[in-house]
Every structure is written in C-alpha cells, then in structure tokens.
Amino acid sequence: MLIRLDKYLADMQVGTRSEVKELIRKKRVTVNDNIVTKPESKINTDGDSVNVDGNAVGYHEYEYFMLNKPAGVVSATDDNTCTTVIDLIKTNNRKDLFPVGRLDKDTEGLLIITNDGAMAHDLLSPKKHVDKTYYAKVKGKISDMEVKQFANGLFVDEELTALPAILKVLSYNSDKDYSEIHVTIHEGKFHQVKRMFTAIGSEVLFLKRITFGALPLDCLLYTSPSP
C-alpha cells in the first residue's frame, strides 16, 4: 500500500501531522537509508524501511483493542461533556479509531475498538446475526415460561419483535429479589436487552457484555456490584 510519509509517521504515533512534518524537514527521517525531506513522499508500507533518528518505524494498517468499558463512559469517538471509549486508549494517538457498535452509558463490558471498517461491518451486519452475550442482574424471579418466551422470539413493542434469544438463569436472591442471568441475543437493537426484560415485567439492574461473537471478556473482569 502506498501512503504519504507524514501520514505513515503520524499513524505510527511518532507525532502529530505537523510534528512529523518538522522531523522530515530537519532531515531526521530516512527511507531505505536515504534522507527524505518531503512530507508528501510516497511510502510502500509493504517494502520500504522507514527510520526516525536511526530508529526503525514499522507500519501496521489496522489496530485492534478489546476494551472492558466501565459505566459512565460513552461509546463515541468524541464528546464535549463525557469521557469516551477512545479517551481510554491512552497509549494511542491514531485519529481513525472507532468503537464497533455501542454500549449504553450505564452498561459495562466488552467493546472492540479498531480502525478496520471491514471487520466492523462483519460484526455489525444484521445479516450476520453475530451472537452477543450479557451478564445481568434483573428484578424479580425469572420463570421457565419467560425463558421460553425469549427462546421463541419475544414481542417487545410495536417497533421490535426480538429474534429467538437464549436466556439462562444463574441464581435468584430472594432477600433482594433479583435474578442473575446470562442472555445471548443475535441482533443489536436500541436498548434491546433492557427493553426485552421490561416487556416481561422485569427491570435490568446491572448489565455487562461478556462475549461478542467468538471473543470473550476475561472472566476475572466481570464481577458486578450488588444492586
């Protein structure tokens, strides 16, 4: 792939676009052992050797981060009032990263951050029906009948009849009247899990995504607070 030298260096976190242009002008950058002074010079990412002050700078087109999103953080690239998931990637200066899908502000768990648009499309495409599993604490005791309702495809409201989902009851706390559950859905509608439990007369008290397709969140990271 051919790419401008200044973009190459900025993508690889050598500095901002203006900073790397200054490095180039000061003759601190070499390509294949030759000093290059034009920021617009084209670099072959598959074959050229780029060095800054004698240090090799390799290129990788795509980057992938698996994030355990905390509550209170928004699934966006930029926000004037709230911390975003991109803000949490503190060691990275790339400007083309984005979250694959979104989790509600109060929802925790697995979120993928990348600049790979093709992978994001495959994970989010409605035609793919990529599984997403959540751990939740929900109000009340979940019955076998409600498990079957989820399995048969739940009518949520006039805008949503959910595809068949797998609901597994883990435990019931009779003192505090809540159930711990795992639920696996095959689509990603707006507030879907919360709306599904509202439809059966329950309420989500805590929600954390623990798998996205074949990618699991480390089990040591998804303990939950008591409601």
Protein language model features and the residues they cover:
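S4-like RNA-binding module at protein N-termini
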Residues: 1-80
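Non-catalytic RNA-recognition surface used by pseudouridine synthases
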Residues: 118-180, 186, 196-198, 204
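Residue-level signal for inorganic ion chemistry
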Residues: 32, 112, 136
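Conserved small/polar residues in nucleotide/adenosyl-binding loops
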Residues: 222-227
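Flexible glycine-/small-residue-rich
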Residues: 54, 66-69, 113-116, 138-140, ...
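Short beta-strands and strand-coil junctions in structured, solvent-facing domains, enriched
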Residues: 16, 72-73, 119-121, 190-192
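Glycine/acidic-rich beta-strand-loop module
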Residues: 91-126
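A short, contiguous, amphipathic alpha-helix enriched in charged residues
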Residues: 77-93, 147, 151
